[in-house]
Amino acid sequence: MPRTEMVRFVRLPVVLLAMAACLASVALGSLHVEESLEMRFAAFKKKYGKVYKDAKEEAFRFRAFEENMEQAKIQAAANPYATFGVTPFSDMTREEFRARYRNGASYFAAAQKRLRKTVNVTTGRAPAAVDWREKGAVTPVKVQGQCGSCWAFSTIGNIEGQWQVAGNPLVSLSEQMLVSCDTIDSGCNGGLMDNAFNWIVNSNGGNVFTEASYPYVSGNGEQPQCQMNGHEIGAAITDHVDLPQDEDAIAAYLAENGPLAIAVDAESFMDYNGGILTSCTSKQLDHGVLLVGYNDNSNPPYWIIKNSWSNMWGEDGYIRIEKGTNQCLMNQAVSSAVVGGPTPPPPPPPPPSATFTQDFCEGKGCTKGCSHATFPTGECVQTTGVGSVIATCGASNLTQIIYPLSRSCSGPSVPITVPLDKCIPILIGSVEYHCSTNPPTKAARLVPHQ
């Protein structure tokens, strides 16, 4: 064989071997990436205690995890000052996450259409950095769970801070009070911070119960019936204010007055691990959070936000977003409760056994043809019509939440307040109410106040 032919014959296997080695390297690299993703999924399941009912569901959750890791890469590319990756929500589809944790869009959209009368704020004197956590005005991060109650956590977080800034001890207050009892909002199906402030002032005398006496139990998505009695009052508010849609004004008000309730577009929050968001999705408000501080000394400057997704998400439950560029639409719906000066908490409400008596009379002066019946407070009482009532005794008034279409205190309701120990004319006679500790009258029905 000629020498040149022999050289060609020798070179050919060498080339083939090199190509085979290259292909093997690519295959091994691909396998390594796949194994890495599977290892991350296994670590995710272990960290968050994830257990799936069968192999089909596990495969579905793995695909969701894979998609979320790809989304995390996209977010990281758009936000060079932040990191994204595995979070407690990494096995959820984007649609599931939106429905469970970002379900307030309709409430916030309606609120944006209303005419807001904002408070006047003097700008230009705010310090370069504020963090109300360092001043003892922020309770530990809480967990809303599988309930669309972010609005309640935002409202209560604001009141906790305002109460402390007014000179009172910091106390953890009850989100469950709002989720179960606020008749303006929709519990786990969404709500609005301004609505919650209004309900507290107009229907609950401005009082807010403590977390210890009325703990949060709606993390599983269930919404227990309202129970107004037997709870300790931990704080009280007199009003609320809306702030201008201006970040300088928001910073000035926060620096002087404490944490603020705000709404944001939380689409970019799902895969967030830490750092400062500078390219936050800003399409529509859908989530309520608490603004607790800012830092203008940083580059970029940032806001500090407390979330209600546990301390296993984000920066121990917090997120930072760039200040001055309306990231996540953060300046669109900012509000705060108003608290008076430092005062001791109001006295506790009557004990669970408290009752009230209705004197129903045929005449208009509460003197002729009268009958008397005693009913429990804080419990569902059926009326002589088709409705039902939950009543609460106050110092001088009786508050009734009337459910005109339900015999089980559910559905649409109307709150009213009537004076105690005073004759009140109604369409079919007159009534008078008295708070007492007498035992309830058996099988009695309340004559509805008309």
From Swiss-Prot:
The consequence of residue 115 to V is: In strain: Rhodesiense WRATAT 1.1
Q: Where is the active site?
A: 150, 287, 307
Record keywords, A-Z:
Disulfide bond, Glycoprotein, Hydrolase, Lysosome, Protease, Signal, Thiol protease, Virulence, Zymogen
Glycosylation sites (chain numbering):
120, 397
InterPro entries reported for this sequence: DUF3586, Papain-like_cys_pep_sf, Pept_asp_AS, Pept_cys_AS, Pept_his_AS, Peptidase_C1A, Peptidase_C1A_C, Peptidase_C1A_papain-like
The UniProt entry, under SUPFAM superfamilies, shows:
Cysteine proteinases
GO molecular function annotations of the record: cysteine-type endopeptidase activity
S-S pairs: 147-188
The record's section on PROSITE patterns has: THIOL_PROTEASE_ASN, THIOL_PROTEASE_CYS, THIOL_PROTEASE_HIS
Instruction: Specify one Pfam family.
Output: Inhibitor_I29
Q: Where in the cell is it found?
A: Lysosome
Reported EC number(s) for this entry are 3.4.22.-
Propeptide residue interval(s): 21-125
Span list, region 108-residue extension: 343-450
> Where's it mainly located?
other
Domain of life (superkingdom) = Eukaryota
The membrane spanning regions, by residue number, are: none
Please cite one Gene Ontology biological process associated with this protein.
Answer: proteolysis
Signal peptide positions are 1-20
GO CC annotations on file:
lysosome
Any extra detail in the entry?
The 108-residue extension appears likely to be processed in part to produce the mature enzyme, and may be involved in targeting the protein within the cell.
* Function, in words: The cysteine proteinases have a potential role in host-parasite interaction and virulence.
Family in the record? Belongs to the peptidase C1 family.
Record protein name field: Cysteine proteinase
Record organism: Trypanosoma brucei brucei
